[in-house]
């Protein structure tokens, strides 16, 4: 019994040093039909499984052009308790043992179309540590056309 308590104590200490962070749901779809695919919305469900606060400092996606990759920084809409909080810039905090539904709006201001293909690299910076998550987008690829008119 004592060894079990010691193990739990070690887990608690490890949790404080290295927060556990999961992306449990990851979907994407194109929104804003007036812009003809110049805007993309990514919807993710973030879960902080740790016993400490975490701060997400950076979220970006990379288009799949190997020659000229482009990092896109989003506008963030965080939904808590059914209320949307609009936040034009990161970072945002997550309390221990909580989850957030997050909408990320990406707009393409490049001089060319960007192809967001099957494999999407989603890059987080959490508590000054970088986490890169590769996820498959559902069923189809789409283009983010340039936003300038």
Where in this protein do the model-derived segments appear?
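Short, cationic, amphipathic peptide segments
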Residues: 1-20
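Short, solvent-exposed loop/turn segments enriched in Ser/Thr/Gly
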Residues: 36-43, 117-118
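Short structured motifs
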Residues: 26-31, 85-91, 105-107
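The feature marks short-to-medium sequence segments in extracytoplasmic or secretory-pathway proteins
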Residues: 51-96
């Amino acid at each position: 019994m004592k060894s079990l308590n010691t193990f739990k104590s070690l887990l608690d200490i490890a949790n404080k040093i290295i927060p556990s962070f999961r992306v449990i749901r990851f979907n994407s779809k194109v929104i804003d039909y007036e812009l003809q695919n110049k805007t993309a919305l990514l919807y993710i469900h973030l879960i902080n499984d740790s016993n400490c606060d975490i701060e997400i400092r950076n979220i970006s996606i990379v288009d799949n052009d190997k020659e000229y990759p482009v990092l896109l920084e989003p506008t963030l809409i965080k939904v808590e308790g059914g209320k949307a909080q609009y936040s034009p810039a990161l970072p945002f905090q997550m309390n221990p043992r909580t989850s957030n539904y997050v909408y990320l709006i990406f707009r393409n201001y490049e001089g060319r179309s960007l192809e967001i293909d099957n494999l999407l690299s989603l890059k987080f910076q959490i508590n000054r540590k970088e986490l890169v998550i590769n996820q498959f987008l559902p069923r189809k690829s789409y283009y983010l056309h340039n936003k300038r008119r």
